[in-house]
Structures are given as C-alpha cells and as structure tokens.
Amino acid sequence: MATASDSKYKRTNTNGMQHQPLDVAIVGGGLVGSLLALHLGKKGHEVNLYEYREDIRTAELVIGRSINLALSARGRRALAEVGLEDALLNHGIPMSGRMLHDVNGKCKIVPYDANTNQCIYSVGRKHLNEVLLNAAEKYPNIHLHFNHKLVSANLDEGNLSMVDPVTKDVKSARADLIVGCDGAYSAVRKEIVKRPRYDFSQTYIEHGYLELCIPPTAGGEFAMPHNYLHIWPRGQFMMIALPNQDRTWTVTLFMPFTQFHSITDQGLLLDFFRQHFPDAIELIGRERLVKDFFKTKAQPLVMIKCRPYHIGAKALIIGDAAHAMVPFYGQGMNAGFEDCSVLTELFNQYGTDLARILPEFSEKRWEDAHAICDLAMYNYIEMRDLVTKRSYLLRKKLDELLFWMMPNTWVPLYNSVSFSHMRYSKCIANRAWQDKILTRVLYGASIASVAAIGGLCYRHVTMGHLERLSTRILSTFQLLKPKASV
C-alpha cells in the first residue's frame, strides 16, 4: 500500500510544477469520500473528511442498506492507484456470469465474458469502507471527523457549518476546496441547486427493493454455486443474490411498491413465493423468509442527473451526489471511484489550479455520468425480463461470436462497461452501430446474412480482421443456435 506522506512539503505534479498543498474538505465518509481522501492525501494535500454518521468500523450494520457491491475494472483501477486493489480482490468473490433461475427451479448460466473469462467481484460494503478508512487514517495529513452533519455552506467562500447529531454542538470549518461525496441526498448538492439555471432532475422508479438472506448449508458451505450472480427474472419483477465471505447470500427482491403493499401477511407471502420463487423458499428457509420480509419496508430507488458538478473554483460534487443511479448495472460505486481517478488525473495535469481542474472535471464527466444512469435504468428491463427471451440469447451469441473474431473492434456493451475504461458515452455509441448491424442479421436469419457482417463492419475493422472474419464465420455459425435451458 502507498505510504503516508508529510503534507508540509511542496508537491510536484507530472508537469514538473511545484505547488502548495490545498486544504480540502470532503463531505461524506462513505466509499467514494474515503477513497478520494486517499487520492488527495497521497498527493500531499491536507484533507479533512466529515461524516454525519458514527464510525462505520464500530457501528452495527444498518438494516435495509445493501451490503453487497460488484467491483469491476473502473473501480479496480481507482483502488490500484492507492495500492488497495489486491487487498480487496483477495477478499472479494469472483462472479463469472449470471445464473438464471426459472419458475421450475432449473438454471441457465449466461457468462459475462465467454471469450476471455473476465469476472466481476462481490465485495462487502462495510468491509470495503473499513479498508479505505483504515488506509486513510495512516496518513498524517488526512483527518477523519465522524458525527459531523453539514447544515449549511457558503460554497463561494469555502465555509462549512456542521452539527453533531448526538451532542448538538455546532462546528465550523473552512477549506480551499469542498467536495461533496455525500450520496444521492447530498447536502452539498442542495446548496449548489440553489444557483440560477442549474440543471437537475430526480427520478424515482415505481419499483422498490427489500433485502433477504440465504444462510449457509448445515455443513457451513454456500447453498448455491457461488461464482455467479444469481437472478430470478419474472418479467415485472425479479430477485437477485450475491455471495458473501461468510457463505451467506444477500438476496434482493425488486418489484413495484404496489406489489409489496399487497403482501400483507404470512400466507400471502408464502403463496407469492410458491408461485414465483419456489426454489428460494427452501434456500432462505420459511421462517427466516417471513421474519426478514416483514421486519423492514421496501426502500425506494432513485436516479439523479445534474450539471455542472462544480461551483467556481471552490466546490465540487462526485459519486452519487452528482449521478446517483439505480443499481442494475453494478456501476454506481465503480463510476464514483472512476470520478476519483479522473479528478486525480486533472490534479496531475494542472497542479492546484482549481479554476481549470473543476470546470474540466464537469465537462469530462457529465455526459458519461448521464449515459451510465440511463444504461442502468435500461438494464433493469433486461435483467428482469429480456434475459429469458430467445432474441436476447441469440443477440448475446452473436455478440460473443463477433467479439471472438474481432476482439479489438467488436466489444459487447457489457464488456466495454465492466471490463474496460472506455468512456460510458462511447460504450453506448458503439452499441448503437452494433445494433444496426445485428438488426439486419437477425432479420435476415440466414448464413448469407451472417456472412454479410464482414461488409457492414468494413469501416470499423482492419483488413487483418476482415481476413479472420471471412475464414471463421462459416465454421462458427453453429454458435448462433440457441441452446436449451439446463
């Protein structure tokens, strides 16, 4: 891990310019805030991290808050930049694909990457936050302040006013830079949206989520194959399960609030599960299912879009404070961590010139952030419904085939989002031209149509790729036939 450094010395950026360390106030000590503290602390800046809750390292887990996260390439890079990637991967559980459960209990495996076998990692939220805070605490120039709730701010002057939720003591602070990492209901963003002509939208979906748990088997093992994200897609609703280090599974039920509200007693709950998730009753356990379902209420899901992310040369929002998204692409944390990487790159480029760093961050990130917010919303439709349709499975086979033949040119959407650092907006642009090609092929439904892909791809591939395409396409056509469920 990177070692702590003395913030009293001048720092040098990648352009060779020396600069005095900044006083930075980070509001929000969750995942993104604590990682940003490490990024800026490593560069020698004086960082004060303010969190309204008590220290998560000594607090009990909050009911209703997901303890699972899917770590992929963008998040891994941001962790690697502060020397923590290996520690988190060693603790995480690799998931190589989705395992789909039908209503009869039969399962089908859909790999994330059938060609190169890349995977995402299930990591515990609390563990990850603890690792980040422990690492931050080792820097003498990073200072952690818990039970500090922001109540007002003068973002033009860099002044903050906070209150201790327990003692009600009022505290103030001043900083050269204020960064809001305080989540979807950001107090820093509330100050920013007061500005005239500020773009802001907030969208709640009609679905909520409620968490359940699958315990280990009597022998202390996982109750299901643990290297997969398990999904029970049911059209208008779905259930997913991610593995934990203690051999339990965090199960999340997503469905319309009207449906949650219609399940008012034990009998209705068990009837609902017998009809839609019969195999899950045995996995969860009847008594545990009833207890966990009724002990808490379904939680809302919100998408936030706004721009710009900065105010002058004094304030910035990142992570969920800037672009909260529904959790169906597993990119919320990864996008927030990527914010840290992008911001650090700008510090490397411009030193401490916040008048250049902050506007450029806003300009670089807003389009990509809006793109992944929209993509996450669409992916809910895919996960709960489309994954069971033959047209979707055929499309995925075509994606895999072309990715195998042209790995540097044809990259499936999921791969570009989860396993690369391509801009989110570019990922969607690539998908658009791929869709045009595949639509022609799917409507053609013949070997000749598949062979025609070579011509349609001409503008996107080199002659070497075309040569491989023409020699392999006929021999691999059998891959396009949909397979029966296992």
Swiss-Prot record:
It is found in: Mitochondrion; Membrane. Its cofactor is FAD. Keywords: FAD, Flavoprotein, Membrane, Mitochondrion, Monooxygenase, NADP, Oxidoreductase, Pyridine nucleotide biosynthesis, Transmembrane, Transmembrane helix. Pathway: Cofactor biosynthesis; NAD(+) biosynthesis; quinolinate from L-kynurenine: step 1/3. InterPro entries: FAD-bd (IPR002938), FAD/NAD-bd_sf (IPR036188), Kynurenine_monooxygenase (IPR027545). The chain crosses the membrane at residues 401-424, 437-459. GO terms for cellular component: mitochondrial outer membrane. It is a multi-pass membrane protein. Its EC number is 1.14.13.9. One of its GO terms (biological process) is NAD metabolic process. The keyword Ribonucleoprotein does not apply. It is an enzyme of class 1 (oxidoreductase). It comes from the Eukaryota. It catalyses: L-kynurenine + NADPH + O2 + H(+) = 3-hydroxy-L-kynurenine + NADP(+) + H2O. One of its GO terms (molecular function) is kynurenine 3-monooxygenase activity. HAMAP family: Kynurenine_monooxygenase (MF_01971). Belongs to the aromatic-ring hydroxylase family. KMO subfamily. Catalyzes the hydroxylation of L-kynurenine (L-Kyn) to form 3-hydroxy-L-kynurenine (L-3OHKyn). Required for synthesis of quinolinic acid. This is Kynurenine 3-monooxygenase. The lineage of its organism: Eukaryota, Metazoa, Ecdysozoa, Arthropoda, Hexapoda.
